[in-house]
């Protein structure tokens, strides 16, 4: 449970350090007006809205951990693109990539449901949400500090590289410390049992066709 809480804390710091503190100014710096700025800020949520049901199904099929890792890789790619983005199209691409695979809330909550009892579930979801909220407090402050105080020459590269480095740390945490949830293990056992039963039926000489 602790690796998951640390993961979401770091993930939200990375996300909010860019989306809140840096993205609006980055887009304006590239020539966008107020309307375009708001559209770019909402792109992530818009894409996530349509992608979330599919991500949920994939997490049911392949497990929570693989989907969290995939989401983390997508965030790493997204922030790396934003770090070097010199056009609005590249910024848009980065937000679409992040939105397509974002699942820290839905899959993270499902993971908690898989590994906790009904009695303790609300407590651990509370810890998870607290880490999420704390990340949103710290992230924008860090992003603003890294971007600098000069409005004519903000350091977008430094802020986005920080976010990408946070994603890299999260990859390490997910790979080596987060255990697979019991839903995938249960699913694998059911699949093996089903296949063994089919095999026994086929090889059973007493079964008539």
Residue ranges, per PLM feature:
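Helix-loop boundary and gating motifs at the non-cytosolic
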Residues: 1-45, 209
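Hydrophobic core of transmembrane alpha-helices in multi-pass small-molecule transporters
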Residues: 9, 78, 89-103
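Helix-breaking motifs and short loop linkers at transmembrane-helix boundaries and internal kinks
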Residues: 31, 63, 84-89, 101
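Structural signature of the two symmetry-related core transmembrane helices
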Residues: 66-81
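Helix-loop-helix hairpin linking two adjacent transmembrane segments in secondary transporters
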Residues: 128-175
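Juxtamembrane intracellular "pre-TM" segments in multi-pass secondary transporters
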Residues: 180-209
């Amino acid at each position: 449970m602790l690796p998951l809480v640390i993961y979401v804390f770091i993930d939200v710091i990375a996300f909010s350090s860019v989306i809140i503190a840096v993205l609006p100014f980055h887009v304006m710096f590239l020539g966008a007006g107020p309307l375009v700025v708001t559209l770019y800020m909402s792109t992530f949520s818009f894409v996530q809205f349509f992608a979330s049901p599919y991500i949920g199904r994939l997490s049911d099929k392949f497990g929570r951990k693989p989907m969290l890792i995939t989401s983390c890789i997508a965030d790493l790619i997204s922030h790396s693109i934003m770090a070097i983005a010199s056009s609005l199209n590249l910024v848009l691409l980065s937000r679409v990539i992040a939105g397509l695979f974002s699942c820290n809330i839905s899959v993270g909550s499902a993971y908690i449901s898989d590994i906790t009892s009904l009695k303790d579930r609300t407590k651990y979801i509370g810890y998870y949400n607290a880490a999420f909220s704390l990340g949103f407090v710290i992230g924008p402050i860090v992003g603003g500090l890294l971007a600098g105080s000069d409005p004519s020459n903000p350091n977008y590269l430094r802020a986005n590289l920080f976010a990408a480095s946070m994603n890299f740390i999260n990859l390490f945490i997910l790979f080596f410390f987060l255990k697979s949830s019991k839903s995938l293990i249960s699913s694998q056992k059911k699949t093996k049992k089903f296949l063994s039963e089919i095999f026994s039926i086929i090889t059973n000489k007493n079964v008539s066709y």
